[in-house]
Amino acid sequence: MIPQSNPTAQRRSGDAQNTNNVAPNSVATTTDTALTASTQSGSSSNNANKKLEYIGVYKIGPEIGKGSFATVYKCIDTTNNKAVAIKSVYRSKLKSKKLLENLEIEIQILKSMKHPHIVGLLDYKQTTSYFHLVMDYCSMGDLSYFIRRRNNLVKSHPVISSLLHCYPSPEGSHGLNEVLVLHFLRQLSSALQFLRDKSLVHRDIKPQNLLLCPPVHSKQEFIDGEFVGMWELPILKIADFGFARFLPSTSMAETLCGSPLYMAPEILRYEKYNAKADLWSVGAVLYEMTVGKPPFKAGNHIELLKNIEKANDKIKFPSAAQVPEPLKQLIRSLLKYNPTERISFNEFFNDSLITCDLDDNDQPLETSQMDENLFISEYISPIAPAERSQFFKEQKKNDSVVRSPSPTTATTATPRQDNVVQQMTKITSPVPDDFALSIARNSSEFNLKKDDMNLEKDYVVVEKRAVEVNALADELAHAGAGADAIPNSRKNSDVDQTNRLASSQQQTETASYRRSSSSGSQKRPSFSERRISLSLSPTNALTKAIGLASNRLFGLTTNSSHSNVSAIAEDDDSSTSNNDASSFSTVIPSTNNHVLLQKLNLATIGEPGTEFDLGSVSNLDEQILDKLELIANIANAVNLYADVKFSQIIPSPPSSDGIEDDTEMLPPKIIHMISQEGIGLYIKTLSLLGRAMDIAGQWWFEKYDAVHGERPSFETTVRINQIVQWIREKYNISLERLEFLKSKSDFTAEETIEDNEPNGTTRVQQAIFAAALGIARETALKELLRNSTDIECSYVTSIYMLLAILEDLEESDRQEVKKIIEKINSRLKNFMGK
């Protein structure tokens, strides 16, 4: 699989479409070092232009897509000055025969694909470090980006503005206009029929792999290019054939691949499947086009399969989507659980919705102001770095709108104690008050290891990583290395009890934020009532969440896990209002953390290196295990903070009469702000979890895939697999919550997007930094006031949160954060030594 980022880089130009001059054995004229410099650049666009780097005759432009194995660049063909997309695949990442085979098959398939609705391979070059696939450039991005961001793009993209003016979505619907749906369906079916004639199954059809190009300039050009649909509308093309296979109608496959949300149930069941799996994916994509979201969602593929089975082939459509009955029937015939009951390809291709004539209005869209070389995401202009610090200053003044002073400041301690507390908090974090602002001011100069300055791009990367994360976890589990395969002191009846508790929590919170239950529910609190819980500062909310989850952070023995959780919950209920209790119950992670750290490694935690150094461990497998445990705990700390944001947005069950007063909803600006903060935190969590999976994957390859690999110890294998399974579950749950927050953010973005909205990475860095300091300060207060509850856990969590941002900082800021970590660690050691 060669993941591509959303929106992936490609744009079909009229001249390039007819060239298709594939040169499989040609070699790039530049050195690998030149491209590597461009790849590692914090701003690939500027560096590429300044250094005038080339791949053959192609001038390297800005990075517009990124995955685990490849980076996509917008480039210029200097022979005709046309834009192309170059997908540069890292040779070093393709360490197994299967990955190399996927790439070779993708290249072979693309070389034979010459169809107007399939992304064409124009050229192919390779160097000692990269495979370069030169492909059509689709400047309008992908279908997923178009569906989710059209309310923002309509203000700045001339073609989309004209398109949605002519074909608006139904009022109250998040889906597309019926005409657009049928137009894209016609083009998708044309490409699928071409693949079917060649006995090809794509196996990864999803909105992210359906790319869009601007409309052609005339009806005659449309006819000459053999396009289908309406000539005045955008052109859809299928991309990313990394999973595709030549699969005759009598053949079956059994490889788990593709995006789970659009994956056929027979693939989710690990059963053999045929080309009909693509038809399920088409039905899922068609549903998303009409409704605005996938037909089924879940935190992992197991839950997804359960949801599909539970639906029992009953596909429901929101009334606001106004989906016509023939379209509903087609979608339902595609989304049949049993592939034998699913509509056949011939029936699909001959459906009246596909064969009927679409009425062209012969009125072209407004394209005069469109730059065809400009990528779609570039139409949403980023904030200028100089304006970021101003935003944060203004945000400080406006914080009172959402947050009230910390309840800790209302202590009843004596004046003398107050003075001591103030001194201690200053000692605990002796950092200049403007340190956080220095992070914002210098954000554009951070030495980031990847260009994650755009949260939208990062979201797509982590979304695509979900397939790899689940595949690796499945491989380890099925190899007999799983905890279920051997006896373990931690796997006993108490663990089962803890798992049941975690499962119960997950079911409760899932039912809550999906509004799946309305019986016996209370009316949603008004905004003034909800402000009570929202006014808690993130620090206080996070501290409370940490207290509730302390047994999981420390990996307490399973004998006491259940009782501790119950005791904490009872104590919390007795000290807070019902409203607060219900609010924070959703913060508790539903996964079971008993596989995590059994030790704190305090001797090394105070001197973290840029690569999360763990000190000297003689055994390489133990080093891998310790590194995985540390990164998993760092990710878990950030995830706790993200869950706080999620709990503030999560919807309450509807009232018994099914009526909600619009005045009782949170203002869109606040929803958008909290959602954006949560999105950034979840993306940071997912990037850390993905990093841990990369380490585990490398270990797995060296120990099992390599011919002369030395087998690890039995116990180490089990422990690493336990962490991998925990990471997989945490990754899937975090990704689902991220998608939920994105839906909230996208829905409110039209009313709240402002030019001075801060950079996404800056916002995340500041939020984590401020929360970590806040936890440390409040923990010092609790320690001074002889309140020893969760002191150890809170200090360690603040350290983990600071470690999460350490690598992304430039050297001067990194040294300041290290000093803070050392101070907190010193206080932790003193407390533990008492």
Curated annotation (Swiss-Prot):
Residues 58-354 form the Protein kinase domain. It is found in: Cytoplasm; Preautophagosomal structure membrane. The active site is at residue 204. Residues 1-27, 394-417, 483-532 are annotated as: Disordered. Keywords: ATP-binding, Autophagy, Cytoplasm, Kinase, Membrane, Nucleotide-binding, Protein transport, Serine/threonine-protein kinase, Transferase, Transport. Disulfide bonds: none annotated. GO terms for biological process: autophagosome assembly; cellular response to nitrogen starvation; DNA damage response; filamentous growth of a unicellular organism; mitophagy; piecemeal microautophagy of the nucleus; protein transport; regulation of autophagy. Belongs to the protein kinase superfamily. Ser/Thr protein kinase family. APG1/unc-51/ULK1 subfamily. This is Serine/threonine-protein kinase ATG1. It comes from Candida albicans (strain SC5314 / ATCC MYA-2876) (Yeast).
